[in-house]
């Protein structure tokens, strides 16, 4: 059963300006795995914008506030598959992960971006 759906749409240039303005402080919004993934790309900003949108989308379905680095987007490498990475999934701190397990919830994530916008949808499902 679907518990909640959260969506966020963000302008990539807004994230680019924030990263330039805040410098290293802006990196505190992202988990190390998110920064490592984005650093491999010729332009990391669209990827980081999509991850920012994922955090916002999750906040819209979660019953209380959480920190920026309490939720992150993970993508595992798949060197033998047709694509270099698996589909994105949400990762959580142990506190959030434990509450998800207790409630029987699973989070589904989809990300996309164009030249101008990044978007994320999070669906919480009760199993």
Curated annotation (Swiss-Prot):
Catalysed reaction, written as an equation: apo-[ACP] + CoA = holo-[ACP] + adenosine 3',5'-bisphosphate + H(+)
Major subcellular site: cytoplasm
Recorded GO MF terms: holo-[acyl-carrier-protein] synthase activity; magnesium ion binding
Organism, as annotated: Deinococcus deserti (strain DSM 17065 / CIP 109153 / LMG 22923 / VCD115)
Cellular component GO terms, alphabetical: cytoplasm
Gene3D superfamilies (UniProt xref): 4'-phosphopantetheinyl transferase domain (3.90.470.20)
Subcellular location(s) per record: Cytoplasm
Cofactor: Mg(2+)
Listed name of the protein: Holo-[acyl-carrier-protein] synthase
Biological-process GO terms, alphabetical: fatty acid biosynthetic process
Enzyme Commission number(s) from the entry: 2.7.8.7
Binding site for Mg(2+): 8, 56
Purpose: Transfers the 4'-phosphopantetheine moiety from coenzyme A to a Ser of acyl-carrier-protein.
């Amino acid at each position: 059963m679907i518990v909640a759906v959260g969506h966020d749409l963000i302008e990539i240039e807004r994230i680019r300006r924030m990263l330039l303005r805040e410098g290293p402080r802006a990196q505190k919004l992202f988990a190390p795995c998110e920064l490592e993934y984005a650093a491999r790309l010729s332009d990391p900003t669209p990827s980081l914008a999509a991850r920012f949108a994922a955090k916002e989308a999750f906040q819209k379905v979660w019953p209380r506030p959480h920190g920026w680095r309490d939720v992150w987007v993970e993508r595992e490498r798949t060197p033998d598959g047709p694509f270099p990475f698996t589909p994105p999934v949400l990762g959580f701190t142990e506190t959030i992960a434990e509450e998800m397990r207790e409630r029987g919830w699973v989070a589904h994530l989809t990300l996309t971006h164009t030249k101008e916008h990044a978007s994320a949808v999070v669906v919480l499902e009760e199993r």
